[in-house]
Swiss-Prot record:
Compartment list: Cytoplasm
Claim: Ribosomal protein is one of the keywords in the record: no
Record protein name field: UDP-N-acetylmuramate--L-alanine ligase
The protein's annotated pathway: Cell wall biogenesis; peptidoglycan biosynthesis
UniProt keywords, alphabetically: ATP-binding, Cell cycle, Cell division, Cell shape, Cell wall biogenesis/degradation, Cytoplasm, Ligase, Nucleotide-binding, Peptidoglycan synthesis
Catalytic function, reaction form: UDP-N-acetyl-alpha-D-muramate + L-alanine + ATP = UDP-N-acetyl-alpha-D-muramoyl-L-alanine + ADP + phosphate + H(+)
Length: 474
């Protein structure tokens, strides 16, 4: 923290295995702070923290916070959590995750990446290009960056790249020197109350940029474009495929595993310069759009065209963002298994469009809706999100702590998908049933795309082996 050394005592993270909490904990540990935490279950994140020397306790009990100096929580942690109760009883400061992240950001100049979708991938791309440019930023991301093997890293420079989560409004604490907004959709209305308040929060986020900074805004997205006139006294750099964009993508051409494109940069004197032949090893037009945001940041920070090209060529992607997790050899070819975090209709459409770009056979979507309230609020959009899938399997809703809502379930979603003209949409009850069904029906060249923010990732991880076993036993 600014003006304070690292000898402040132990900092305890409640729910340290959460992807947002773990990154802050890891960076603070690497900075020399004494860090520990607790979580409700073992996970690969917990295992990774322990391997880096951070003490993690399973189970949340009052005694876990004995003798600590500060307790850090996320908004998911309730005030009746036994560790929080014990901290308050003992007058131990309890701070939110965003407040701690904001303290870290005060130590450095920051690129803060916000938006309803695409934050994690865009944050990773920005970090990749700054690495390529020799800037060596500290990074705190909302997903595992494959080249780091972690979602966080302590860099040597005065720059930090962070994912700014808008879900609970806490991103307004994060004052970025450079701010990126990828898109704005009506999500997290339980917190904001209305979409108008969501949009107002993004305007405030942009206006928190200092006068010497800039905001990189995706002009292709209508809601982002609509807030540009409301930003009156901060410099705005637009990006996208629009002819009006300051950083424009053109000539997008599919290549194996990704896309090649040209970035056309509008200079301050009105002239243009082109960065041609950028190869992004990640499929999907939406990912080219994310890459343009990273180009805008990199150019602002003086990274050369050649280093931008080289940085993208080495981009290793993000865990659970169109990640290949398996392959099944079926004699005449192979079936590819993809794991993706997409759990909102906009994300699902983008992921399936990316799959359609490179698949030789069929696209088979396996979706696990995440939260009953999200499915209720976006049922129509979910039912229309699967046009690029030849076959759809819907798993039971992952509740994420919510209670069921009558009439809001995967069966209702599947009925709506079929009512809209889809010829092959089905329910599946579990990973074993899915493996049996796929073993009997997959064809060479098919791509199975598992979608969701719940435990569908575990299905994806074991699916290739399960299909192979079923086929061997047939």
């Amino acid at each position: 923290m600014k003006g304070v050394g690292t000898e402040i005592g132990t900092i305890h993270f409640v729910g340290i295995g959460g992807i947002g909490m773990s990154g802050i904990a890891e960076v603070m540990h690497n900075m020399g702070y004494s860090v520990q935490g607790s979580d409700m279950a073992e996970s690969y994140v917990v295992e990774g923290l322990r391997s880096r020397g951070i003490k993690v306790m399973i189970g949340q009990k009052a005694e876990n916070v004995a003798g600590v100096a500060v307790v850090v929580t996320s908004t998911a942690v309730k005030r009746d959590n036994p560790e929080v109760v014990a901290a308050l009883e003992n007058r131990i400061p309890v701070v939110r995750r965003a407040e701690m992240l904001a303290e870290l950001m005060r130590l450095k100049s920051t690129v803060a990446v916000a938006g309803t979708h695409g934050k994690t991938t865009t944050t990773s791309m920005v970090a990749c290009l700054l690495d390529a440019g020799g800037i060596d930023p500290t990074v705190i991301n909302g997903g595992i960056i494959n080249s780091y093997g972690s979602n966080a890293r302590l860099g040597d420079s005065d720059w930090m790249v962070v994912e700014a989560d808008e879900s609970d409004g806490s991103f307004l604490r994060l004052d970025g020197t450079l701010a990126v907004v990828t898109n704005i959709d009506p999500e997290h209305l339980d917190h904001y109350g209305s979409f108008e308040r969501v949009k107002s929060a993004f305007v405030e986020f942009i206006e928190n940029v200092p006068f010497y900074g800039a905001a990189m805004l995706c002009i292709d997205h209508p809601e982002v474009q609509a807030i540009i006139p409301k930003v009156r006294d901060r410099r705005v750099v637009t990006y996208g495929f629009s002819a009006q964009a300051d950083v424009r993508g053109e000539g997008v051409t599919p290549i194996p595993g990704g896309n090649r494109f040209t970035a056309v940069l509008r200079q301050r004197d009105g002239s243009f310069r082109r960065i041609e032949g950028i190869e992004l090893p990640m499929p999907g037009r939406h990912n080219v759009q994310n890459a343009l945001a990273a180009v805008a940041v990199a150019v602002e920070m003086g990274v050369s065209d050649e280093l931008i090209r080289g940085g993208f060529a080495k981009f290793g992607g993000v865990k659970r963002r169109f990640t290949k997790v398996g392959e099944v050899d079926i004699g005449s070819g192979a079936v590819t298994i993809i794991d993706d975090y997409g759990h909102h209709p906009v994300e699902i459409r983008a992921v399936l469009a990316a799959a359609r770009e490179g698949v030789q056979g069929r696209v088979i979507a396996v979706v696990q809706p995440h939260r009953f309230t999200r499915l209720r609020d976006h049922m129509d959009e979910f039912q229309g999100a699967f046009n690029d899938a030849d076959v759809v399997y819907a798993a039971p809703v992952y509740p994420a702590g919510e209670q069921p809502i009558e009439g809001v379930d995967s069966a209702a979603m599947v009925e709506g998908i079929k009512a809209r003209g889809h010829r092959s949409a089905h329910l599946t009850t579990g990973a074993d049933e899915l493996a049996k069904e796929l073993a009997a029906t997959v064809q060479a060249g098919d791509m199975v795309v598992c979608l969701g923010a719940g435990d569908i990732t575990k299905w994806a991880a074991g699916l290739a082996d399960a299909i192979a076993r079923e086929r061997a036993g047939a």
